[in-house]
Amino acid sequence: MGIRVAVAGASGYAGGELLRLITGHPEFDLVAATAHSQAGHRLDTVHPQLTGLELVLAETDPAALADADLVFLALPHGESATLAAQLPPKVRVVDLGADHRLADPYAWANYYGGTHAGQWTYGLPELPGQRERIAATTRVANPGCYASAIVLALAPLIAAGAAQPADVVVVAASGASGAGRAAKAHLIAGEVMGDLSPYRVGAHQHVPEIKQATGATSLSFTPVLAPMPRGILATVTAVPVRDVDPQAVLAEAYADAPFVHVLPEGRWPHTAATLGSNSCHLQATVDVDAGRLIVVSGLDNLGRGAAGQAVQNANIMLGLPETTGLSVWGVSP
């Protein structure tokens, strides 16, 4: 018997990707999966891509997760904290929701509402010292999908004194799976295909998370819904502090990071190259007219932006090589 793993909230897109990764992981044994509306259904009927996975979804409650060594929480924002508080301290927990990402209760109230549950260790291993913090805890808050792409692009530039922390501007496009699996009129094919539409302009909930993780002091973020199932492409711009090669700064920061790839000069990220992988692709330059630093970041919002990153964090928590059970390469086209 390997490491016993349970997934709470297994019926959604992130939950389905978690199940795919867990069942292919050489050290993990899936012992439980839970859901609300889909409880009582076999996993392979809820997720047709998991043909032959006969485990039946249980109701989401602590008893269903009691036999697990490792629990992934893929629940809507506001639901993870209550369930996590009822799990034994020795159980390792990775929360893919937002409940434990923010340190500031006022930021939580402004962007999410409700009671602030407190902060867990932030699960972005590539930040300085973060692998060690993740390895030493039993509770990890997985970053948001947009935050993953943007923090990886921006954090090294601010940390190196190459970019000003103020006046950061981001425009990022995401596939429709980022909005979840629940039926919504604006996400049906007839609405999404052939269209680009911004949403939560100037008030996206990942803004305080990005500022917290990068040290940015002001951030203008415009998210865009793109006509594709999955993937994120973020363009991050910042004011330089000094004459600097942003690509060189990023390359040095991620020289030993197996899942972050600073592309050769002249090659720019595109989402299809990252699909199915836990990788983030980066490229950077200086705007010849405005003089601003530009970093483009691409990743799979369900992989590196959710389930893949959660497994990477779990590997570190368990003392396993962080690449175990994860792909560096995408499946394009």
Curated annotation (Swiss-Prot):
Main location: cytoplasm
Residues forming coiled coils: none
Recorded superkingdom: Bacteria
Substrates-to-products reaction catalysed: N-acetyl-L-glutamate 5-semialdehyde + phosphate + NADP(+) = N-acetyl-L-glutamyl 5-phosphate + NADPH + H(+)
GO cellular component, one term: cytoplasm
Pfam short name (any one): Semialdhyde_dhC_1
E.C. numbers: 1.2.1.38
Pathway the protein takes part in: Amino-acid biosynthesis; L-arginine biosynthesis; N(2)-acetyl-L-ornithine from L-glutamate: step 3/4
Subcellular location: Cytoplasm
Active site: 145
EC top class named in words: oxidoreductase
Gene3D superfamilies: Dihydrodipicolinate Reductase, domain 2, NAD(P)-binding Rossmann-like Domain
Record keywords, A-Z: Amino-acid biosynthesis, Arginine biosynthesis, Cytoplasm, NADP, Oxidoreductase
Function in brief: Catalyzes the NADPH-dependent reduction of N-acetyl-5-glutamyl phosphate to yield N-acetyl-L-glutamate 5-semialdehyde.
Entry's family note: Belongs to the NAGSA dehydrogenase family. Type 1 subfamily.
Name of the protein described by the UniProt record: N-acetyl-gamma-glutamyl-phosphate reductase
Organism: Salinispora tropica (strain ATCC BAA-916 / DSM 44818 / JCM 13857 / NBRC 105044 / CNB-440)
